[in-house]
Swiss-Prot record:
<dbReference type="InterPro" id="IPR038050">
    <property type="entry name" value="Neuro_actylchol_rec"/>
</dbReference>
<dbReference type="GO" id="GO:0030424">
    <property type="term" value="C:axon"/>
</dbReference>
<keyword id="KW-1015">Disulfide bond</keyword>
<keyword id="KW-0868">Chloride</keyword>
<dbReference type="GO" id="GO:0004888">
    <property type="term" value="F:transmembrane signaling receptor activity"/>
</dbReference>
<feature type="glycosylation site" description="N-linked (GlcNAc...) asparagine">
    <location>
        <position position="39"/>
    </location>
</feature>
<feature type="transmembrane region" description="Helical">
    <location>
        <begin position="326"/>
        <end position="346"/>
    </location>
</feature>
<keyword id="KW-1003">Cell membrane</keyword>
<feature type="topological domain" description="Extracellular">
    <location>
        <begin position="402"/>
        <end position="408"/>
    </location>
</feature>
<keyword id="KW-0813">Transport</keyword>
<comment type="subunit">
    <text>Does not form a functional homopentameric ion channel. Forms a functional heteropentameric ion channel composed of acc-1 and acc-4. May interact with acc-2; the interaction does not result in significant heteropentameric ion channel activity.</text>
</comment>
<feature type="glycosylation site" description="N-linked (GlcNAc...) asparagine">
    <location>
        <position position="163"/>
    </location>
</feature>
<dbReference type="InterPro" id="IPR006028">
    <property type="entry name" value="GABAA/Glycine_rcpt"/>
</dbReference>
<comment type="function">
    <text>Probable acetylcholine-gated chloride channel subunit. Does not have ion channel activity alone as a homopentamer, but forms a functional heteropentameric ion channel with acc-1. May function with lgc-46 to regulate synaptic transmission and synaptic vesicle release in response to acetylcholine in cholinergic motor neurons.</text>
</comment>
<keyword id="KW-1071">Ligand-gated ion channel</keyword>
<dbReference type="InterPro" id="IPR006201">
    <property type="entry name" value="Neur_channel"/>
</dbReference>
<dbReference type="GO" id="GO:0005230">
    <property type="term" value="F:extracellular ligand-gated monoatomic ion channel activity"/>
</dbReference>
Length: 408
């Protein structure tokens, strides 16, 4: 009996010790278990992906930028985005624009899909990495000035895909040449062309071509309008260009600008009309108002001359006879003719109102009436407007029409 009681007491004592131990462990776990949990390492069964810096370091290790990708005959696709055309300078026949140029090619040596990359493409510092890899060294060979934008940093974007495809884009401000005959000025067009080609690789090494999956030239603004011009057409083409080092692919971007001639209609043509019309007023003043008629005619001629000079000063020096030259000179001729008519009337009116021009028509076997100053004024008030109307029909419908057809 005593033995049973002793065993029970031992069990009760051990149970109390066990409960106190569990309580102590619970209190300790309340503060220390998180630390222990952090120290526990869970086995990672998946392979960790490789970051961009590690990939760049590995693919450039032993890379030679002088070697042609794939052994040669690299295909480089070109795309142009036109951001803005800032101005067209007629005196120097050039235009200034901001564009994005995109170059795409494939370099198998830069493929990194086997390196378990974290993403299928990576954007890198174009200004730095581009100098370490092969690139086509292409440029606008006919540009007068070209600068890559550097605000707030150099605007060069370079993206490398896991299969080795390269996407190179940069934003550039350049000045290129334009051509125009000016024969139809002010209803003329400016045709501006940019030639893009590889500067160091001929067709045996690199094939330059326009991109085919999307339009090769895109106007980002939708339409481009300048104070004097509006962009009416743009196109892309290519041709082979022969140089001493070989044959090169040349990509051509053509931009056609139509002049907005509303300014010249208001500032040149309308004043010319008014000057010619004013010169006709002298026909109604009579032979007695010779000084007044002279003032009207001379002032009209001087006003037209100064107006013409202001327009010519803003145009390039060219030997072509422009449409506006024909208009201004013809208008001057009409005003000058009115002054000649005034001189005849003044001559007839020197001896009074009975002065006249004797006609001798014996060779026609008919009688001629004498031409008095009044009759000459009356005839001039009809002949001059009719002649000017005929000139306008010829100028606007025949002369300009033929010039426009010839220059298209």
């Amino acid at each position: 009996m005593r033995l049973i009681i002793l065993v029970i007491s031992i069990l009760i004592s051990n149970a109390g010790s066990l409960l106190r131990s569990l309580e102590d462990d619970s209190n300790e776990c309340m503060f220390n278990c998180p630390k222990r949990a952090r120290n526990v390492s869970v086995p990672h069964t998946e392979k960790t992906c490789m970051g961009d810096d590690a990939i760049i370091a590995q693919i450039l290790d032993g890379y030679n930028k002088l070697d042609l990708p794939g052994g040669g005959h690299v295909v480089v696709s070109i795309e142009i985005w036109v951001q803005e055309v800032s101005k067209i300078i007629e005196i120097t026949s050039e235009f200034e624009l901001d564009i994005y140029v995109t170059e795409r090619w494939t370099d198998p040596s830069l493929a990194y899909s086997h390196l378990n990359p974290c993403k299928s493409n990576m954007s890198v510092d174009g200004a730095t990495i581009l100098n370490k890899i092969w690139n086509p060294h292409a440029c606008f060979v006919n540009s007068k000035l070209a600068n890559i934008h550097e605000s707030p940093f150099k605007n060069i974007f370079l993206q490398i895909y896991s299969n080795g495809s390269i996407w190179h884009n940069y934003r550039i401000k350049l000045t290129g040449p334009c051509s125009s005959t000016l024969r139809t000025f002010p209803i003329d067009q400016q045709r501006c062309m940019l030639f893009y080609e590889s500067f160091t690789h001929n067709t045996d090494q690199v094939k330059m071509e326009w991109i085919t999956t999307v339009p090769p030239i895109t106007i980002l603004k939708g339409n481009i309008t300048l104070p004097d011009y509006v962009l009416v057409d743009f196109s892309s083409s290519s041709e082979l260009r022969l140089y001493p080092p070989g044959i090169f692919n040349e990509l051509i971007a053509t931009f056609t600008f139509q002049r907005l001639y509303g300014f010249y209609i208001l500032q040149v043509y309308v004043p010319a009309y008014i000057s010619v019309f004013i010169s006709w007023v002298s026909f109604t003043l009579g032979a007695e108002q010779i000084p007044s008629r002279t003032t009207v005619g001379v002032n009209s001629l001087l006003a037209l001359t100064f107006q013409f000079g202001a327009v010519v000063n803003n145009l390039p020096k060219t030997s072509d006879v422009k449409a506006i030259d024909v208009w201004i000179l013809s208008s001057m001729a009409f005003i000058f003719a009115s002054l000649i008519e005034l001189a005849v009337v003044g001559y007839l009116s020197r001896d009074g109102q009975h002065g006249s021009i004797k006609c001798r028509c014996s060779w026609l076997c008919m009688n001629c009436k004498d031409w008095t100053a009044l009759k000459i004024d009356q005839m001039s008030s009809i002949v001059f407007p009719v002649s000017f109307l005929a000139f306008n029909i010829w100028y606007w419908f025949i002369f300009l029409g033929k010039l426009l057809v010839r220059t298209i």
